[in-house]
């Protein structure tokens, strides 16, 4: 597959998440997805990715992600993203604040056989917690 095809897979991955169509995730993500621990208590793999997204949707029902930059080389695609939503539900033990948040992240996806097989990501959790008003720095 070409680099442009790899980037197209990552764009599709993000579209599926933004539509909250987790059943469609298997179109672009391997069932055996390798990830580091996504969130405490969440398993790795495609089911863990789905569970982590459900946690975000519980806390932020209007949760969306925008791809700000997309780079690819070989079998890897890197995305710089901005995530946003309004905290109207409980989120990881934090009661709803009603606050709109916007925070950034970056991830690298490795593509094989037309699917994401590995995913590494980092988000600005400090900014998220500051905007929710639960972390003062």
Go through each PLM region and give its residues.
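C-terminal and inter-domain tail/linker signature
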Residues: 1-137
């Amino acid at each position: 597959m070409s680099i442009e095809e790899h980037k197209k897979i990552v764009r599709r991955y993000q579209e599926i998440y933004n539509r909250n169509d987790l059943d469609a995730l298997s179109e672009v993500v391997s069932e055996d997805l390798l990830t580091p621990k996504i969130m405490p208590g969440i398993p790795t793999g495609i089911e863990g990715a789905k569970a982590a997204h459900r946690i975000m949707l519980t806390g932020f029902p209007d949760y969306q992600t925008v791809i700000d930059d997309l780079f690819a080389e070989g079998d890897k695609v890197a995305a710089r993203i901005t995530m946003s939503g309004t905290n109207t539900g409980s989120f990881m033990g934090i009661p709803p604040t009603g606050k709109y948040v916007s925070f950034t992240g970056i991830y690298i996806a490795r593509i094989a056989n037309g699917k994401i097989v590995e995913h590494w990501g980092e988000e600005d959790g400090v900014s998220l917690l500051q905007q929710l008003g639960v972390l003062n720095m």
